[in-house]
Amino acid sequence: MKRPLRLIIFAGIALVLFYFVQETFFNDDNYIKPLLQERKAKDLTFRGRTNSPLPDESRRNFKNLVYYEPNLDLRVKAKVAQLPKQDTLLMPMTNGSTEAYLRYATATFELQGQPQRLTLYKKVNRTADEEEQLFVPFTDKTNGFETYGGGRFLDIPFEEDAETVVLDFNRAYSPFCAFNPDYVCPVPPQDNRLSIAIPAGEKTYEGAH
C-alpha cells in the first residue's frame, strides 16, 4: 500500500508542477505585454519626425494606431515546405512598377476549421536585417472594412531548415502607403489572398489619406 500511495503523491506533485510551469511560461501576459509594448513603440515612431510615414499635418495630430485585441488563437503554427524551384516573382507595386521577390516556401495551417496556405517570400535585393526573415503579404476578408483595403504584411523570423513557422497575425501591419500616398508598397499576390477574415493585428487608421 505504501508504494502506490507514494506514486499517487508523486504524480500529484508532478501535475501541480506541470500546471505551475505552464502558467509561468505560457500564460497570456507573457505574450501580450511585449506585444503591447511593441505597439506603443510603433506609436512613438509615428509621432517622431525622422521615421514616421505620416505627412506633417497628420503626424502632428496623430494619437495612436488602432488594433484588434490580441488573440492567441490567431497566432498559429504552420508547416513549412520549401519550394523545389524557388523562382523569382516580379511583385506588382502600388505605383505600377514591380519588385523582385523569391518564392521561398509555402506555409500550411488551419483557421476557422478550414485549411489555409500562404507563400513565404524573400526580397531579392534584401538588406542584412532582412536576411533571416520572410515576408508575407496577404489579403483577407477584413480588408476595406476594418483593415487597409490593399492588404497587410507579416515579417517572420525563420531558420533555414525549420519545418514549422509561427504566423502571428496579431503582428499583421499595414504598409506605409496606407498612411501616405507618397510611399510605394507591394501588392499581395494572388496566391496569398485568404478567403476568411483575420480579425487580428493592425486596423485601418482613421487619419489615413
Cite the ranges covered by each PLM segment.
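Hydrophobic membrane-insertion alpha-helices, especially the h-region
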Residues: 6-23
